[in-house]
Regions:
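N-terminal alpha-helical interaction blocks
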Residues: 1-13
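N-terminal targeting/trafficking signals and adjacent low-complexity tails
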Residues: 15-18
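Residues immediately within or flanking Cys/His clusters that coordinate Zn2+
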Residues: 22, 41
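Short cysteine-rich clusters marking metal-coordination/redox-active sites
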Residues: 25-28, 44-47
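Cys/His-rich microdomains that often coordinate metals
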Residues: 31-32, 50-51
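Long, charge-rich boundary regions
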Residues: 52-128
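Cleft-lining beta-strand/loop regions that shape enzyme active-site pockets
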Residues: 104-186, 193
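Conserved catalytic cores of soluble enzyme domains
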Residues: 158-276
């Protein structure tokens, strides 16, 4: 019996639909048209879940169009320890660079937010979970020093799994280096606004993420040092529900305000105006 013509037409139609038109929300499982999601700043229109985004997309959302000028754009990581886990660290770097088209896990530069010039540092979770190695720490330190030298407000968007284990002590020393640079920036009267996105953990939380004069967080962002299972096994006590969420930390005074992604530009510009910078 010959196949009905409509079946062949339906199959042809399905094959003609390109990949990537739809995205499933990881929070509510709603399927959302990709262009609609991008127009909504990668926030789910159904449950308001703030999805993780690349540093480039964050810069496009945060800064005035066409104003971003990168600092130290060509700085790339090395492998001084010759570290090997499942594969050599240098291969892991190169694979991630090919996949992301980025040199490392942070973008730094200058730009304008509603007409106010700022220095920005934006971490990129798509590059090895936004982990902080020597390049991330050095680029952020130089950005902080640029803000100090030019008396500009500083905005750092944190989104990281913490220190990069493949760099061992070279990674851990970035906590002290960035914190020292921020102390000098503070002594010079600088304004530092930290924005904590999901997730902000480990050595990043233990250093520059929590040193802002003003600390904003995106809704429901995971913020903490160690994971809840590690903490529970260490202290052997039941932990409060949601104790590592932005909402819990706001109530405890560790976060100044939870800011929706759509309002972030406005809130940052208000703080800059209020500070007189």
């Amino acid at each position: 019996m010959p196949e009905p013509t409509w079946i062949g037409a339906e199959i042809a139609t399905k094959k003609a639909v390109p990949d990537g038109l739809w995205t499933q929300c990881p929070e509510c499982a709603e399927t959302v048209f990709r262009k609609s999601l991008e127009a909504n700043l990668m926030v789910c229109p159904k449950c308001d879940h703030h999805m993780r985004i690349s540093a480039r997309r964050r810069i496009d959302q945060l800064l005035d169009p066409g104003t971003f000028e990168a600092l130290d754009a060509d700085m790339a990581p090395m492998d001084p320890l010759g570290f090997v886990d499942q594969k050599p660290y240098i291969e892991r770097i190169r694979d991630t660079q090919r996949k992301t088209k980025e040199q490392d896990g942070v973008q730094t530069g200058t730009g304008f937010i509603k007409g106010r010039k700022v220095v920005v540092g934006v971490m990129d979770f798509t590059f090895m979970a936004g982990s902080m190695g020597s390049v991330v720490g050095e680029k952020l330190t130089r950005a902080i020093e640029h803000a100090t030298d030019h008396n500009l407000p500083l905005v750092i968007v944190c989104c990281s799994g913490g220190a990069r284990m493949q760099e061992s002590g070279f990674s851990l020393m970035q906590m002290a280096k960035t914190s020292a640079a921020l102390a000098r920036f503070d002594s010079a009267g600088g304004l530092y606004i930290a924005v904590l996105a999901d997730p902000t953990t480990g050595g990043v939380t233990a250093s520059y993420a929590m040193l802002g004069d003003v600390i904003f967080a995106e809704p429901k962002a995971l913020i903490g040092f160690a994971g809840p299972r590690v903490i529970q096994q260490t202290i052997r006590q039941e932990l409060p529900e949601g104790f590592q969420t932005a909402e819990f930390l706001e109530k405890a005074g560790f976060v100044d305000r939870i800011v929706h992604r759509s309002a972030l530009r406005t809130e940052i510009s208000r703080i800059i105006d209020y500070s007189g910078k």
